Amino acid sequence: MFRIGKETQYAVVEMGMSHAGEIERLSKCARPDVGIITCIGVSHIGNLGSQENICKAKLEICAGLPEGAPLVLNGDDPFLRKAVLPDHVRPVWFSLGDENADVCALSIQQDEKGMSFVLEDHEEGTFLVKIPAMGRHNVANALAAYCAATRLGLNARRVIAGLADFEQTGMRQKVVHVRGVDVIEDCYNANPDSMKAALAMFREYPCKRRFALLGDMLELGDISRAAHEEVGRQAVENKVDYLVT
């Protein structure tokens, strides 16, 4: 934050947390113009106790948002849908498939190069979007980024062009081709939601046989055993041929 100078037009700040109260403090320090909550998963549930508490902790981002600021929210998340939002923020809902949302993705398709979909925006219109990242979860991420940028006043077509040039960060969906084998390196971190998303993406990846090498998931508290077992079931449902843990 201290390295952001006057010449900086836009700064994207990730506000991580593992306990209640942390995001409120960060948001009051950053004073963002727009907030984004992508989903309510189970990361750090060992510290916070429940997804309801995780939702409350993430909504602390509102503490630093000014009056009328856009708050971009995942309309497919049941915890966010039930959440009571403060009056001073303006919710902007995105969804994979729900045309009642402010912004939605339809006709979603995946190939070895990434995802394509039709984006419908009640304010800006309809667009064909392509992103060089695989998995429906990355479509949701693209919608969140689009909502934030356009509600800050950026041109919708310019934002979509930017999404087409998106580059993954390290250890996220890096595909290496070795002697007829495609190795997908996607191991930056692991939680039940990211594991399920990766396995769902893997199912749609065009190949003959699928080998999944999965590591541990931490900070899950009492649900750790059940969460690991559920990921095993997800591997079966998503047609993994060989599973190594």
Where in this protein do the model-derived segments appear?
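Short glycine/serine/threonine-rich phosphate/pyrophosphate-binding segments
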Residues: 19-23, 139-142, 192-196
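Short beta-strand segments
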Residues: 14, 38-39, 74, 213-215
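Active-site beta-alpha connecting loops in nucleotide-dependent enzymes
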Residues: 169-171, 187-245
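Active-site phosphate/ATP/adenylate-binding loop shared across adenylate-forming ligases
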Residues: 1-9
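Switch II (G3) loop of P-loop NTPases
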Residues: 8-23, 183-189
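Acidic, Mg2+-coordinating active-site environments of NTP-dependent enzymes
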Residues: 33-183, 207-208, 233-242
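Short, glycine/acidic-enriched loop or turn micro-motifs at the edges of active sites
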Residues: 17, 42, 77, 188-190, ...
